[in-house]
Amino acid sequence: MTDDILEVEHLTREFSVRGETVTAVDDVSFTVHRGEALGLVGESGSGKSTTARCVLRLIEPTRGTVRMNGVDITTLRRRALKDFRARAQMVFQDPYSSLDPRMRVREIIAEGIRIHRPRAKDSVVTDEIVELLEVVGLRPDHLDRLPAAFSGGERQRIGIARALAVNPELLVCDEPVASLDVSIQAQILNLFQELKATRGLTLLFIAHDLATVRHLCDRVAVMQQGAIREIGTREQLYTNPQDPYTQSLIAAVPEPNPIEERRKLTARRAAAAAKVAEGAA
């Protein structure tokens, strides 16, 4: 029997826009197994980030249930909701706007610890922060610097350390590498892979393309227009995608081998020509 840490059933989120109801998330259901990384992939406006925010109750679902460890978090209030927020944390997309520019690194990372463990001694908190900085690839002498002193990749590492500070079981990552240079993206993805392996973290990883999740995620769910079009293992989606939208995402993944890329391009052109010929007949 699979141990599911997260169960999402019939999740729907509607917004009122100029007097009309817009459905951003439309009857979405999926599970996340404990210790795995599930990728949630789709183009801008597909509803993936809204889904992530509903999962963490950063916004309230219109309908549906979200269970973590068997508990429906949509019904939680006050202390129970606070406890849930220690078990599930988010890493945001923009490392520039997600950190308070007036707070030093030690204050940013300590904030969650102070909320969930208000009696923790200052020396203990400092030791934990130093350890977290080392875990994410930063140095102890970064403690008293402001966010402006860091690059985008370093700021994202600070954001990851902040999320880890309360020892979560689930990390929801909302396009955490989308704003970074390609070389830095690889480093951050490797960090998530390492955290998953060494800390037993479960990841719900949001991305806008399949290339980003290719080496990190165990399973992938593809979203379009608020609904999940296809979900399966990484191997299933990359080798035998069933939904036409998934197939288009696969076709858009860059191929590092130029010979293989030409082969794929030739195959796509041949398939397109065959469809045209079939229509003409």
Locations of regions flagged by a protein language model:
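Conserved catalytic motifs of ABC-family nucleotide-binding domains
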Residues: N167
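Conserved ABC transporter NBD signature motif
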Residues: G64-D72
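Helix-to-loop junction immediately C-terminal to a conserved catalytic motif
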Residues: L56
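Conserved ABC ATPase "signature" region
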Residues: D72, S123-D141, I250
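Conserved ABC ATPase signature
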Residues: L146-F150, E154
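Short catalytic/signature loops enriched in Gly
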Residues: T2-D4, T21, I231-A281
